[in-house]
Amino acid sequence: MSPDEQLELLRRFAPTLHFDALERWRPGLVDGYLEHSTVLDGDKHVLPGTPPAEAAMREHRHNYNAQLNPLGNDLNLNTYRRSTEMLESYGREQDLAGAGIAYGRVVPVGRAFFLQYWLFYPDNPCVLPPGRHDGDWELVQIKVEREGEGFAATQVTLAEHGKPATHPVEASRRGEGPSVFVAVDSHACYFKQGAHPALLSDVCDPAGERGAKPALALLPIAPDKRDWVHWAGRWGLDRGGGTRLAIGLHLKPTPWPLTELNKAGDSPKSPAHQGKSWRSPRVFAGEGTVRKWSTVQLQRLAHLIGYATWPKTSPRVEVRPAAEVSGTAASTYVIEAGSAGHFLRRVTFVSVAFFEQLPDGTRRGLGLQRVRPGQAGTFGIPHEGELVWRAAGYNVLRQRGNPVPDRHPQAQAQ
């Protein structure tokens, strides 16, 4: 099916969105949001090249710990995202009588097609902290099947706070898109207006508005997946610590990337990282099962593996000028490491990083050297200024133990 045919099918069955009379936002283009955003690596470090954020998202597309900082606002300014500046920067001049923009995706499964309408909101201003975050992705999914020479909608699935709810389409309405009611602030989608049970009640009272269909654009999926659809980070800053409340403690950082998943809080992941809704729309609609583990299950397993294998003992490491032993130049050093740990926690190699202390107080990296416990190696490390080194031991699973503090090479024997 060509892109034009996909858009035609998406337009025909596009949902009619009904918004609460007090709703301030409509789903919009991602471009305006990314144009004013920086990308953070973890909680603080700003990745280079931002804003705009899109280039950094492509470069760091596998960084699960990254998060968008909309408009570069201060991490502690919880009220900033409600300010006039953010509204104007995002393009608040949008027509609130309309239904905004939806990003479409068509997934063929047998003789049926699953039409996905991804809706992006720049803000999720819930009352309680666990639900308060920047950036918000919502999904409306419609299954259409061939009927004679055309198509007919047979079921609709809405992601109500991530939990899919599927309803069949009445026979009299199979040739059109469904009506969807959007809750104020949370933007969760429902089949009926009124109050709906949630952490706090979700409410949608359109006050007699007839609703409207969103404009449509296909999700910009690149062949090499270097796009914001597949970016592994989160679409906003943690405002309320919702993930920590739900999942619990985070262990020490390790080379296992899954131990850092969800660290940015409860802001959403990109569409391609939202589990079975992307991976298997049929399963998301309740038509089957998927055997792949969920992100949370993988994270918990990684935590257990990390806790069971993390080498808590620092190895004994010595660095001394090689001239003590063989009379070679002072820029050649012997590195010797002792054994540490046991079983899976046993240190299998030691990595030593060397730095040159410059006159202005900064340091210049000179590279890494590796040695095995119980062995010694001789390495050439040219330098002019004072030499500083630090070391850390790694086990067989490449998990790093407690690092050895910064030290200087032992004095040369007289």
Predicted regions and their residues:
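Short, compositionally biased P/S/T/A/G/V-rich stretches that sit at domain boundaries
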Residues: 311-328, 338-340
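Beta-strand-rich modules
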Residues: 385-396
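Short strand-edge motifs at loop-to-beta-strand transitions and within beta-strands
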Residues: 375-379
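A domain-level signal for the mature, folded cores of soluble proteins
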Residues: 1-136, 148-318
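Surface-exposed loop/edge segments in extracytoplasmic proteins
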Residues: 360-369, 400
